[in-house]
Every structure is written in structure tokens, then in C-alpha cells.
Amino acid sequence: MRIDVLSLFPDMFTPLKQSILGKAIDKGALDFHVTDFRDYTENKHNNVDDYPFGGGAGMLLMAQPIFDAMAAVEKAAGDKGHVVLLDPAGRKFDHHVAEELAQKSHLTFIAGHYEGYDERIRELVDDEISLGDYVLTGGELGAMVIIDATARFLPDVLGNQVSAEEDSFQDNLLEFPQYTRPADFRGRKVPDVLMSGNHAKIAEWRLKESLRRTWQRRPDLLENRVLTQTERDLLDDIKHE
């Protein structure tokens, strides 16, 4: 997958080139580029924003630098990709959106600043996404969150594909508790079933604990899940414990 970002602050994306994503970039599983759209301004002061027509508070991102930066991306990549605008008015980002975006071969993020965008910028956009009902100072943090979450679904990004498949929210359930050595840490013992070697019992315990954690912390997720009879029985047990 190729990922492009249009941003005024390219250095903010340096951390994405570390750790798991950095390794994915190094081995070619991810092709990552950041374009400073200030480089594409046509005015002598390199301004990328201006006052809104009709008055109002704040400044708006101008269309020209974004259009020209996008043209440069298209020239370099052969296409502009699936263009995502980070905007509070967009659809709310979640696990399923990340999985959907991971099916694209090329993503381009527009990370804006200021009060908002010149409406004509939206002509370039295929998707508008929001992280939630709050406002950030710019779109960079939102873009980084989406890129990180989306990249986890790409082949060869995670060392173990099962990790992505078993992560929280993969199946509208929160992840079950996990433990590593030692089996007894200062009197805090690992549940016996996890050391029993009985894979069927371990799977049942994990499912039950996923259901328990979801019911206790995010019951709304259960509303969007069609429970099997086994899951209904386990959930009934949990509620009556």
C-alpha cells in the first residue's frame, strides 16, 4: 500500500517510521510519503490560509496549495489514491473503517489546520473521517491514528496475523485478559486454565472473559453482535455470578 499525507508539519509523522510501521516501510510492505503543501503556494508570503468570504472567525485553508500538492502526488504515484479528509463532520472512525481502508492500494490524507477548508477542496475528496466528537488543532494526529490502525490489517505489517485478528473490536468484543511469566507474581496468580494445556477450555475461558469485559466496559458493542447460543449461555452465567 502507498500512503500519502498532505500536511504543513511533515516532521510530526517521523514517529510513524519507527517500530512496526518502520519495519513495514523498510521491507516494502508500506510506501509512505508526506508532502508539505506550503511548498505549492503561489503567493510571495507562502500563505496557505485566508479570511472567509462573508466574514466570520478564523482562517480557511486555501484551495490552490491543496489542489497543486494533490496534482504532484498524482504525478508521482500514478493516481491520487483514495483521498481522506480529516474533518469533525466526517463519519466516525472505528475498527471497521480501518479494515475497509486497508483494502485500498493507495490512501491520501489531507491534514488541515485553521478554522476549516475552502469548500472547493472537497471536490478532491473521496472520504471524510472524524476521530470523534471533539476538535484537535490539526489533522495530523487524526491521520496518524488512522494510518496506524489501518496498517495493522496489511499483509506483512504485523509479525503475526493472528494478532490483528484477535485484537479488541475485531469481532465486536474486547480482548480477553492475557498473562506472561511468572505464573505467580507476588501472590497474583495466572488462572489455572491457561496453564492446563486444554485448548478447548482455554478457548472457552477466553471467550467468556471477552464477553465479561465487553459487557462491563462497552455493552454497546454487544448490541451490534449476533450472539451464538454458546455466547448467550456464557453471558447469562456472567450476569448471574
Swiss-Prot record:
One of its GO terms (biological process) is tRNA N1-guanine methylation. Transmembrane segments: none annotated. One of its GO terms (molecular function) is tRNA (guanine(37)-N1)-methyltransferase activity. NCBIfam families: PRK00026.1 (NF000648), trmD (TIGR00088). This is tRNA (guanine-N(1)-)-methyltransferase. S-adenosyl-L-methionine binds at residues 112, 131-136. It is found in: Cytoplasm. It comes from Leuconostoc citreum (strain KM20).
